[in-house]
Amino acid sequence: PIAGSMVLAAILLKLGGYGIIRMMQVLPTTKTDMFLPFIVLALWGAILANLTCLQQTDLKSLIAYSSISHMGLVVAAIIIQTPWSLSGAMALMIAHGFTSSALFCLANTTYERTHTRILILTRGFHNILPMTTTWWLLTNLMNIATPPTLNFTSELLIMSSLFNWCPTTIILLGLSMLITASYSLHMFLSTQMGPTLLDNQTEPTHSREHLLMALHIIPLVMISMKPELII
């Protein structure tokens, strides 16, 4: 059920990040030099999740692994325990909560019309449902943290705090962001561009679907304009 996927990605996955924030406050801050292996492990886990996304053929699996990769960045930022990193982690959890929920919603919109989640079988929607393609484009741009979204602000905070902590982590972080952009554009091009492979009569989009997408994207853009509400 799509509602379960949306709640799982948007809320329940972030509860783990909140729990780590609370637990890190209990640990002694004088031993922070020991945290570098855990930071590298979190970033390496994000890269592995991103590489897994690149080889997915199932749309929902790709979005689910995308959520895991973003949580790797959140964990790496939380471990540092600086004000910038904690602000970036909190902002990224909120931003990715909206983004991943919107992606699952769009995947369900596609599934209801094609009855398949295979990427190669859902292509050609830009000819049939151009407004849905617009929502796909906006959501994927948010997923790869393009300005002026909150995703960009949060990843910038995380990147700067990680670089100040250990400059060599920028290699892992940059590689993770590069692969994120690759699979996001691959997902968009695979599901929207090219000739339509299915001959079924496609049902037009409903107002409720556009409203649902607007309620994901508009709050995220509004928070991006005033990030001090959460940072």
Curated annotation (Swiss-Prot):
One matching Pfam family: Proton_antipo_M
Key word Transferase present: no
InterPro entries: NADH_UbQ_OxRdtase, ND/Mrp_TM
GO MF terms, alphabetically ordered: NADH dehydrogenase (ubiquinone) activity; ubiquinone binding
GO BP term (any one): ATP synthesis coupled electron transport
Family indicated by similarity: Belongs to the complex I subunit 4 family.
Keywords: Electron transport, Membrane, Mitochondrion, NAD, Respiratory chain, Translocase, Transmembrane, Transmembrane helix, Transport, Ubiquinone
Residue spans crossing the bilayer: 1-21, 34-54, 62-84, 89-111, 118-138, 169-189
A GO cellular component entry from the record: mitochondrial membrane
Keyword Membrane found: yes
Cellular localisation: Mitochondrion membrane
Reactions this protein catalyses: a ubiquinone + NADH + 5 H(+)(in) = a ubiquinol + NAD(+) + 4 H(+)(out)
Membrane-topology annotation of the record: Multi-pass membrane protein
Family annotation (PANTHER family): NADH-UBIQUINONE OXIDOREDUCTASE CHAIN 4 (PTHR43507:SF20)
Function: Core subunit of the mitochondrial membrane respiratory chain NADH dehydrogenase (Complex I) that is believed to belong to the minimal assembly required for catalysis. Complex I functions in the transfer of electrons from NADH to the respiratory chain. The immediate electron acceptor for the enzyme is believed to be ubiquinone.
Protein name (database record): NADH-ubiquinone oxidoreductase chain 4
Enzyme Commission number(s): 7.1.1.2
Organism: Protobothrops elegans
